C-alpha cells in the first residue's frame, strides 16, 4: 500500500465505524422512582443511552409510567442535528406483585419499529417458563447493511436461568411462524454465568449447543460492576447469516461506564450493578461489507483497584 493511500484508508475506516449502528443492552438495577430522583445516576444513564442507536433498558419498576417520558425529555432536550429518541415499552411483566418492564429506546432518524408483541408463555406441557416474558420487537432501518432485525429481550430469574435461556429457542420458532423475519438478536441480563449457569449446564441450553446461534459476549467477559465479582451475566446472541456477517469486527464488547466516566465503585453502583453490553451493525453506506466471521473478544478488562 502506498503512503498516499494509507491515510485515506484510515479515514474511510473511521467514517465506516462512525456510521455503524450501535445496539446496546443495559440492566439498570431497580430503575424506579428513587433512581429517577438521583440526578447523578440519571446523568450517567442518559450518557450511556446517548452512545447507542438502539438500547434495551431492563428492570424498569415504574407503576406510574414516568421513567421513559422523563428519559425522552432529557434525551431530546437540545438534540443535535435533529436526532431525537423514541421508545417502545412492554407491559408490566412478572409473577405475583413483582413487576418489571422492558423498554427499547431508539434514534428515530435511524430506525423504526415495524411490529411488536409479547410472547405468550403458555406452551403445551411447559407453562410459564419465563419470569418476564420476552417483548419481541421487529426493527427496520435503511441505514444498516441488514435492513430489518428482530430483537428478543430477556431478564431471567437467576435460579431458573438455564431453563429460560434454553426456552429462547421456542421464542425464536414462534416469531418465525408469525413473521417473515430472518435476522435475530437475543440480548439482556441472562444471568448466564457463575453459579447460575455452571459449565456443566451449557449442554442443556439449545441456544448454546446449536451453532447457528452466535454468541457475541463470551463466557470469559465480566459484565458486573463490583470488583468482587467476575461473571458474564449479560449476553448478546445472533441468528441469521446476514446479520452475523454485518457485525462490525471487534465491536462486540462490555462498556465499562465506571472507567469511562471516572466514577468510584460506589458511584457506579448507584447507577447499576451491571455494565451494558453492545455491538455494531455495518452501515449500508460502508465502502465494503466485511464477510469475516464474528469472533469472541479476548478478555482485556481487569477489575478496578
Swiss-Prot record:
Stretches the record annotates as Not required for free DNA-nuclease activity but required for activity towards liposome-coated DNA: 284-305
Entry GO terms, CC: endoplasmic reticulum; extracellular region; nucleus
Gene3D superfamilies from the UniProt entry: Endonuclease/exonuclease/phosphatase (3.60.10.10)
EC number: 3.1.21.-
Key word Endoplasmic reticulum present: yes
Alphabetized Pfam families for the sequence: Exo_endo_phos
Disulfide bridges in this chain: 194-231
SMART domains: DNaseIc (SM00476)
pH dependence: Optimum pH is about 7.2.
Modifications made to the protein after synthesis: Poly-ADP-ribosylated by PARP1. ADP-ribosylation negatively regulates enzymatic activity during apoptosis.
GO biological process: apoptotic DNA fragmentation; DNA metabolic process; neutrophil activation involved in immune response; programmed cell death involved in cell development; regulation of acute inflammatory response; regulation of neutrophil mediated cytotoxicity
Extent of the signal sequence: 1-20
Cofactor entry: Ca(2+); Mg(2+)
Motif (Bipartite nuclear localization signal): 35-51
Catalytic residues identified in the record: 100, 155
Entry keyword set: ADP-ribosylation, Apoptosis, Calcium, Disulfide bond, Endonuclease, Endoplasmic reticulum, Hydrolase, Necrosis, Nuclease, Nucleus, Secreted, Signal, Systemic lupus erythematosus
Tissue spec: Liver and spleen.
Activity control summary: Inhibited by zinc.
Disease tied to this protein: Systemic lupus erythematosus 16: A rare autosomal recessive form of systemic lupus erythematosus with childhood onset, characterized by high frequency of anti-neutrophil cytoplasmic antibodies and lupus nephritis. Systemic lupus erythematosus is a chronic, relapsing, inflammatory, and often febrile multisystemic disorder of connective tissue, characterized principally by involvement of the skin, joints, kidneys and serosal membranes.
Descriptive protein name: Deoxyribonuclease gamma
